[in-house]
Amino acid sequence: MAVNTVLVCETQVPLVRGGAELLVQQLVSELRARGVATDRVSLPFKWYPKDEILPHAAAWRLLDLSESNGRPIDLIVATKFPTYFARHPNKVCWLVHQHRAVYELCNTQYSDFGNEELDVALRDRVMALDESMLAECRGLYTISQTVSNRLQMYNGLASTPLYHPPLMARQLAHGEYGNYVLSVARLEKNKRVDLAVRAMAHLPSHLRLVVVGDGSFREFVEKAAEASGASDRITFAGAVSDDALVALYRDALCLVYVPYDEDYGLATLEAFLAQKPVITARDSGGTLEFVRDGDNGFVVEPDPVAVAGAVAKLDADRALTASLGAHGRDLARTITWDTVIDRLLSHG
């Protein structure tokens, strides 16, 4: 059966916009470009205090998305927890991530869940519900092998990774390898932008750092810049327009992107499409599916001295920088929307 109508389901955190929001925006646009009547379904999601989690999941379960105003909906695409709780006879999931605080982030500094009795009970309940709701899906896909590995490890569910290109894929281009390092990430604890900031204390004075992004940890990162002694060489650009970001990528030396256990890491592919090497960390998760140490970037310890050492190599050898950047570009150009759309629509 041909798929003519699709709803893409997303959670919304008001005033916050990141990779998941861009993914949904792109998916809707790509489906419409192929003649598929597509719309998005959004509900706010609040995960704090913890007793808000299950009611917000229940809100999605109350939704019957099989039709709208008498018009049949052929397919729904769920993305993040708890969008896959929605009801539809032809539901597929392209999973960005589950509620990570109860899974791989549990008992780490990035989660408010630990081994307390109430935490364990709620965690077990969320995991059981996830397994039940995801089992309803006619197709189970993820945005990366990293996310697929988590699904298999924690829920025993097999899935297929579907990689997608960044929003600005057609605009990103190389200009020159300038004397500034770029960081593009929300300023949140798990993004570890402070590693890039603290690395500046170990780099020569002709190199600068431009930090793109905003978030709840901005003050923390700014204090790290002050403590580094290199704050005069660090610019906090905040959230910037697409055109401004394209321009920053064009003439950067490289991208430093060292999050903790990232789901995907669109900034990696953005940098590659601008022929910029990427420096990431050995525990950065999804970025390691793209960054090949010594081939298109460097994989280092999550330590400012190690980050600085990788940047220094690129600064000292611009021919190496160009070679790594070209290899990254070639890899990024193999990732297209056609594969994603074909797989999702195969469940008509």
PLM features per residue range, with description:
Residues 222-240:
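Nucleotide-activated donor-binding/catalytic signature segment of Leloir-type glycosyltransferases, i.e.
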